[in-house]
Amino acid sequence: MPNKRNVELLATLKENLERAQGSFFLVNYQGLPAKETHALRQALKQNGARLFVAKNTLIRLALKELGLPELDGLQGPSAVVFYEDPVAAAKTLVQFAKSNPKGIPQVKSGLLQGQILTAKDVEALAELPTMDELRAELVGVLQAPMAELVGVLGGVARELVGILEAYAEKKAA
C-alpha cells in the first residue's frame, strides 16, 4: 500500500512533467549542502527553472504513467529540473557546478521535446545563447537598417539646412 506522501509527490511530479511537456533535466545533487542547495534553487528560479527532489522509483513511475522514456542516470540521489528556457537552465546548472569544488550538481541526462539528452548534450546546450539573448540579437538586427535610415535622412536634412544657410548668406551679401 503506497503511503500518502508518495502518492502526493507522484501527483505533483506528474503535474510538473505535464506542464513542462515532458522536458526536464535529471541531476545528481548528492554532497551539496543545504545552504548551497538553496542557492541553486534560487539561481534556477531566477532563470525560470525549478528543482524538484524525488525518489527514483517515483520518477520512473511518473515517466511510465505519462508514456515518457525512462532516462539513464536514475541511480543514486536524483532531482528533476523543470524549466521554461532549456538553455538558461542548462547554463545555470553548468555554471553552478563549475563554481562548486566538487562539481555538483552533476547533470545525469534530460529530455527536451521528446529527445533524450546525455550530460554532454546538456553541456552543449549551455553554450547556446538564451532566448533573451536571441531576442536581443534579433532586435539589434531589425534596428540596424532603421538606424541607418534615420542617419541618412538626418544627413539629408543637415545638407538642406546648410544649402539654405549658404543661399541666405549669398542673398544677404
Swiss-Prot record:
Stored Gene3D superfamilies: 3.30.70.1730, 6.10.250.290
Keywords, in A-Z order: Ribonucleoprotein, Ribosomal protein, RNA-binding, rRNA-binding
Superkingdom assignment: Bacteria
SUPFAM superfamilies the UniProt entry points to: Ribosomal protein L10-like (SSF160369)
Any GO molecular function: large ribosomal subunit rRNA binding
BP GO annotations: translation
GO terms for cellular component: ribonucleoprotein complex; ribosome
UniProt xrefs under InterPro entries: Ribosomal_uL10, Ribosomal_uL10-like_sf, Ribosomal_uL10_bac, Ribosomal_uL10_bac_type
PTM characteristics: The N-terminus is blocked.
Transmembrane segments: none
Pfam family, one: Ribosomal_L10
Complexes and interactors: Part of the 50S ribosomal subunit. Forms part of the ribosomal stalk which helps the ribosome interact with GTP-bound translation factors. Forms a heptameric L10(L12)2(L12)2(L12)2 complex, where L10 forms an elongated spine to which 3 L12 dimers bind in a sequential fashion.
Matches recorded under NCBIfam families: PRK00099.1-1
Family indicated by similarity: Belongs to the universal ribosomal protein uL10 family.
Function comment: Forms part of the ribosomal stalk, playing a central role in the interaction of the ribosome with GTP-bound translation factors.
Protein name: Large ribosomal subunit protein uL10
Species this protein is from: Thermus thermophilus (strain ATCC 27634 / DSM 579 / HB8)
Lineage of source species: Bacteria, Thermotogati, Deinococcota, Deinococci, Thermales
